Amino acid sequence: VELLRDAISRETAYGQGLVPAYAESLRQVFLDAGFPPEALTIVPYGETASLVLRYEGDGSSGRRPILFSSHMDVVPADPESWLRHPFELQEDETFFYGRGVLDNKFDVTLLTTLFVWLKESGFVPNRDLVIAFTGDEESFQETVQQLARDYRDLVDAEYALVVDGGGGVLNDANEAIQFQ
């Protein structure tokens, strides 16, 4: 919960210039878990940045990496229009509240926690696993384009899983009929 609390406290909306500091804080979490410095790359882009982590596997699968993509930025939030402060994680017996809980700092926190747990458990994947946290999904998505164009070697993968907030629609029987 502390990692999510830290994430929510960071106002990483477009134009705030705070995504690079958030990327650096995540980089430090990965370093503290035992990932080597050369496995982590922060790629600056204007006032924002991307963070790429390569979790090196033993190569026994003979396959290319799996890429996990998510984003560190959020939509702007005016505290005056919120019932709770958007940049303070709050919780009750059922829910967490704060800007980014659904889109998308929970998912960034989840991936970070998962990779840290795997590393600290001594897990060695049979191929490389790559995280690409981008910095401007909520605005221009230029960091994704930059990674694909200029840093292909960091993010090239057999396939990608986009871990992002979303939603869906249930029918009267509580069965999912649409995903977003």
Residue positions per predicted region:
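Acidic/His- and Gly-rich active-site-bordering loop/insert found
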Residues: V1-R99, E120-R127
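Acidic/histidine-rich catalytic neighborhood of metal-dependent amide-processing enzymes
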Residues: F95, L102-Q180
